[in-house]
């Protein structure tokens, strides 16, 4: 596991000892990948005591109509899982009517109509602000991380923002903050259901 093969003169492979890297040198407290509309924030790397938030929207292939989807991880468990793709995978009625739609993604559905075409959809969120800055690997973890993202829900034309934060209160304790705002552009709001 600490060895790799390298080519030398005459395409002869030889084993070289390679020092294993430390995960902490490559992981940052907050990481944002706009090309796939995904954001991850964490307060550490401890398998039992650290907390993590994952946010994603739809940007590219194999995506669902999920708005600002959120998953929570902590204490070694998936605490707020995304529902996945269903029993019959992509060909099932359960996928078409539930697993690919807003209610299965820990997000807000507006007036019961929030949706958009799935597969190869381009409905990403925009990162409005965050702390610490995205992709600064090797820096120490802070006691607070936050991100604020914005999304336009196309069916109801609702402007949505979601602020997520992790607050570390001790070496083994902390909590999440989730503030979701949703408002239709032209008013006439009936309901904004949080699933």
Language-model features, listed with the residues they occupy:
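Single conserved hydrophobic/aromatic residue that forms the stacking wall/gate
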Residues: 2-13
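Catalytic and substrate-binding regions of extracellular carbohydrate-active enzymes
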Residues: 11-195
């Amino acid at each position: 596991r600490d060895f790799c093969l390298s080519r030398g003169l005459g395409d002869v492979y030889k084993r070289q000892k390679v020092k294993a890297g430390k995960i902490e040198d490559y992981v940052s407290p907050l990481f944002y990948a706009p090309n796939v509309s995904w954001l991850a924030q964490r307060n550490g790397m401890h398998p039992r005591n650290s907390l993590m938030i994952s946010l994603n929207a739809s940007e590219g292939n194999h995506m669902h109509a999920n708005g600002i989807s959120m998953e929570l991880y902590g204490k070694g468990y998936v605490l707020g899982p995304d529902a996945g793709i269903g029993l019959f995978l992509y060909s099932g009625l359960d996928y078409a009517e539930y697993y690919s739609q807003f209610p299965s993604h820990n997000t807000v559905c507006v007036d019961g109509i929030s949706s958009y075409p799935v597969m190869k959809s381009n409905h990403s969120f925009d990162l409005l602000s965050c702390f610490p800055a995205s992709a600064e690997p090797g820096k120490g973890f802070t006691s607070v991380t936050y991100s604020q993202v914005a999304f336009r829900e196309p069916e109801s034309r609702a402007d949505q923002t979601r602020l997520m934060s992790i607050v570390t209160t001790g070496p083994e304790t902390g909590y999440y903050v989730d503030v979701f705002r949703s408002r239709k552009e032209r008013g006439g709001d009936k309901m904004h259901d949080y699933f």
